[in-house]
Amino acid sequence: MKSNTFLTEVTWKVTSVALLMLLITGFSILAGCNKKSSIAETAPAGERLTGYVNEDAQPESTGSNNGYFWSLYREGGSGSITFGNAGNFAISYSNVTDIVGGKGWNPGSARNIGYNVGALSGSYNFVGIYGWTTSPLIEYYVAEMGNVTGGTFINNVSSDGHSYSFYKSLRVDAPSIIGTATFWQYKDTWGGSSTGSNRSVNMTNHINNWRNSGGQGFGSYNYQILALEAWGTKSGYINATVW
């Protein structure tokens, strides 16, 4: 009888431990499921964009996405670019010395560019068309929002119902698409665009004026993008689409 009682007690204890382990395992599985659901429900809107996210573009990252070229350059701070469908992109940046990036084409051309800036917050210096040529090496801007004047005023050019001021300046031993170099900047500034509406930029008008009045010609097309640039310890965000 003692032997049977001992076996009964052992059996009861083993059964109790097994049941306890099953309960703990089940609770852990449920907790894990709830955690995943919570993460999915609170994911930032920017993370719902599909495509590549570059967390640390320094000094420059480039690539292609959905048939478009993209570029992101950064000095200091932090910055990332995220891609949506077609020509959509979003850039977030914090405490940057300089950041310039966006989406477009490589090579560029004298095309008619459409764009829509859906969201823009924080501090920035420029939003518009940005690109480069080689032979000669030229960095060019068409400022739809913000201001990139500075240097020598050349003339005014009319395009898309607006008057742009053309400024030209020389950069000496500065970062470029071929490394540190000396090159000219061509900068057309209007600055009157706004968020949430479809706009267009006829690059033929700008390029013809640069070629005829810039004094350096225009060179061979390198990349050409709808871009944001911010410098001077700025932070902000843009979500825009180009076509």
Task: Tell what function each PLM region has.
Residues 16-28:
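Bacterial N-terminal signal peptides
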Residues 1-5, 26-53:
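Bacterial Sec-dependent N-terminal signal peptides
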Residues 3-19:
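Bacterial N-terminal signal peptides that target proteins for export
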Residues 136-196:
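An exposed acidic His-Trp-rich patch
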Residues 65-69, 73-86, 157-172, 188, ...:
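Extracellular-facing/secreted segment signature in eukaryotic proteins
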Residues 52-123:
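Short N-terminal edge-element motif at the start of the domain
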Residues 98-159:
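Extracellular-facing segments of soluble proteins and assemblies that are Gly/Ser/Thr-biased and enriched
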Residues 199-243:
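Long, compositionally biased interface segments
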